[in-house]
From Swiss-Prot:
Cited SUPFAM superfamilies: FAD/NAD(P)-binding domain
Name of this protein: Opine oxidase subunit A
Enzyme class: oxidoreductase
Lineage summary: Bacteria, Pseudomonadati, Pseudomonadota, Alphaproteobacteria, Hyphomicrobiales
Functional summary from the UniProt entry: Oxidative cleavage of octopine into L-arginine and pyruvate.
Length: 503
C-alpha cells in the first residue's frame, strides 16, 4: 500500500467512507487507523505536506535541523511514515470551505464537503467526517501589533520548521504558554542572539494552579517543562509579571514598552513575537451546526463531543486540538479514537473489535492528559490581554475595527457578537472572525461584567468558511438543481458542452 497523492480536484472520488480534514497528528492517525480496516479514506489538508503545525515539514526536514527543532518534533516521524504508506487519497494544498449534513436516506451519503484543489472546486460525499483541524493561536491585540516586524510565535515557528528562517534581532517574545518557551528554546539552540522574553502570565501561586500541581508532577511533561524554563533563563533575558505591552514604531517595530512592578520600561526590538496560548479551531464544526460549549479552564469555545469524538451532528467527529487543547501525543490518540468510533458507527468493524481498541486508546489518552489542568491554570492569560482596554488598539484586522468602535457599538445593547455585526463589520472580513472572535467575546464579557462567555457566545458561521473565487465555483458540476436554480428551466431543456457550460 502507498499514499495516493491527489493534485487536482477531479482526481478525488465522488464518495468516501471516511473523509479526514487536516493532516496533523490527529488527522494522520485517523487516516491510518481507518484505512487499515479497509475503509475508503481521503485526507484533505491545506499544507503542502503532511504533519500539521506541530510536525510541519517532518517528511522533508534534514537532520541538521534536529538540534534546534528538538526531540518532540521528531517523535512525529513514525506516524508520518505510516501515513505515507497507508492506502489513502491525500490532497495537499486543499481548502475545505463547506461541510453540510443532511438526513440519512437510502443510497445517499450523510455529509457533503466543498473543497478546492489546484484552483477548481468540487463537492465530495461521505458518511463520516473527522475534523482534525487543530488549534489556532489566541489573538493578542496590543498597541502596535499590526506593525511590520510583529507576528505570532506560531508564525515564527512555522518559518523555522519550513525554511530554517530566523527572526532578525533584537527578538522579543511576549505572552505566556508552553509554546512561547518552546520557541524561545528553539531560537536559543538555533543561535539567535539578543533574545528577551516578556512573560505576561499571572502569579503561579494561585489556588487554581497549586491544586493541580501534584498531578502535574506525575505527568510526562514535568521534566521537559523544567528543562525548557532553565535553558531559556540561562540564555535569554526573562522578565516575569508583565502587566501591559505597547509596541512602538513608525514604519516597523522599533521597541517594546512594558509595565512591570511599579514602573514602565522599554527595550529595543526588531522582531516581536506574540503568544498567549492556543484555542481550538472550530470554523468547520461551527458552520456545520455542531454544538459548541465554553471551556472556562482554557478560555475558549470547543465542540461538544463524547469521549470518542462524536459531535452533536451524526456523522461528524472531532479529533485533536480542535476538540480541546491537549497536545500532539494526545491528538494522535484522539484521531485513532475518532476513526474507530466512525468505523463502528458505519458498521465497518465489529463492535467487539472497536470496543477493545477504544478501551486501549483511552488508557493512552489518560496518560497524555495528566498534568493538562495544571498547564491550563498556570497559563490562563490576564484579563487585560484577553480584553484590551487601549481605545485605538485594532481588534478586527480585516476591517480595522478598534476597541473604541467596539465599545461604542456594545453600548447600544447587542446581546452577542452576531448582533454586534449589525453595528460594525467586526468579523465580516476575509478571515470571517478567526482572528477576532475570541477577543470580541471577551470584550463583551468585560463590558457586561456579570455575564459569562457562554452567555455571550461567539460568531455563528456559515459556509463558505474560507474565501472562494467565482472561478473555483464555476468548476463545480452543473447538477440538475443548479441548472434549474440559474435558468428556471428543467435540466432536460438544456444542451451542455463537454466542459459543462450552459448553451
Amino acid at each position: 500500500m502507498t499514499l495516493r497523492e491527489v493534485s487536482v480536484a477531479t482526481d478525488l472520488s465522488d464518495f468516501y467512507d471516511l473523509l479526514v480534514i487536516g493532516a496533523g497528528p490527529a488527522g494522520m492517525a485517523a487516516a491510518v487507523e481507518a484505512s487499515a480496516s479497509g475503509a475508503r479514506v481521503a485526507v484533505l489538508d491545506e499544507n503542502p505536506r503532511p504533519g500539521g503545525q506541530i510536525y510541519r515539514e517532518i517528511t522533508r526536514n534534514s537532520p541538521d535541523r534536529r538540534t534546534y527543532l528538538g526531540p518532540d518534533y521528531w517523535k512525529g516521524q513514525p506516524l508520518a511514515e505510516a501515513f505515507c504508506l497507508s492506502n489513502v487519497d491525500y490532497a495537499s494544498r486543499a481548502t475545505v470551505w463547506s461541510l453540510e449534513t443532511r438526513d440519512k436516506t437510502a443510497g445517499q451519503a450523510r455529509n457533503v464537503v466543498g473543497v478546492t484543489v489546484a484552483g477548481s472546486a468540487r463537492m465530495v460525499e461521505t458518511n463520516a467526517v473527522v475534523l482534525a483541524t487543530g488549534a489556532q493561536e489566541r489573538p493578542m491585540p496590543v498597541p502596535g501589533w499590526t506593525l511590520p516586524g510583529v507576528m505570532t510565535a506560531g508564525a515564527a515557528q512555522i518559518a523555522l520548521k519550513a525554511a530554517g528562517a530566523m527572526p532578525a534581532g533584537p527578538v522579543v517574545l511576549i505572552g505566556c504558554g508552553p509554546l512561547l518557551y518552546l520557541l524561545a528554546s528553539q531560537l536559543v539552540d538555533a543561535g539567535v542572539p539578543d533574545l528577551t522574553v516578556l512573560d505576561t502570565a499571572q502569579s503561579p501561586f494561585r489556588g487554581a494552579v497549586l491544586r493541580h500541581m501534584p498531578e502535574f508532577l506525575l505527568s510526562p511533561y514535568v521534566l521537559k517543562g523544567i528543562g525548557l524554563l532553565l535553558k531559556v533563563r540561562r540564555h535569554a533575558q526573562v522578565v516575569y509579571g508583565v502587566r501591559s505591552i505597547a509596541i512602538i514604531g513608525s514604519q516597523h517595530a522599533e521597541s517594546v514598552r512594558y509595565a512591570v512592578g511599579q514602573g514602565e520600561r522599554s527595550i529595543p526590538a526588531k522582531s516581536v513575537l506574540l503568544h498567549q496560548g492556543v484555542i481550538p479551531s472550530t470554523s468547520l464544526s461551527n458552520a456545520a451546526g455542531c454544538e459548541l460549549q465554553w471551556n472556562d479552564e482554557q478560555r475558549a469555545f470547543q465542540p461538544v463531543t463524547d469521549h470518542d469524538g462524536r459531535t452533536t451532528k451524526a456523522g461528524i467527529y472531532v479529533a485533536g486540538d480542535g476538540a480541546g487543547i491537549a497536545g500532539a501525543q494526545a491528538a494522535e490518540v484522539s484521531g485513532r479514537l475518532a476513526a474507530l468510533a466512525a468505523l463502528a458507527d458505519l458498521k465497518l468493524v465489529s463492535t467487539q473489535t472497536s470496543s477493545t481498541s477504544i478501551k486501549s486508546r483511552h488508557a493512552q489518552a489518560r496518560r497524555f492528559l495528566r498534568g493538562r489542568a495544571f498547564l491550563d491554570a498556570l497559563y490562563t492569560p490576564r484579563q487585560s490581554f484577553l480584553a484590551p482596554s487601549a481605545p485605538e488598539t485594532i481588534v478586527c484586522r480585516c476591517e480595522e475595527i478598534t476597541v473604541r468602535k467596539l465599545r461604542e457599538a456594545i453600548a447600544l445593547g447587542p446581546p452577542g457578537p452576531n448582533q454586534l455585526k449589525t453595528f460594525v463589520r467586526c468579523g465580516m472580513g476575509q478571515c470571517q472572525g478567526r482572528l477576532c472572535a475570541a477577543t470580541v467575546t471577551e470584550i463583551m464579557v468585560a463590558e457586561e461584567r456579570k455575564v459569562s462567555p457562554a452567555d455571550v457566545g461567539t460568531y455563528r458561521l456559515r459556509s463558505p468558511v474560507k474565501p472562494v473565487r467565482l472561478a473555483e465555483l464555476a468548476h463545480l458540476p452543473h447538477t440538475a438543481r443548479a441548472l434549474k436554480a440559474v435558468t428556471g428551466r428543467d435540466p432536460v431543456d438544456h444542451d451542455t458542452t463537454e466542459t459543462g457550460h450552459i448553451l
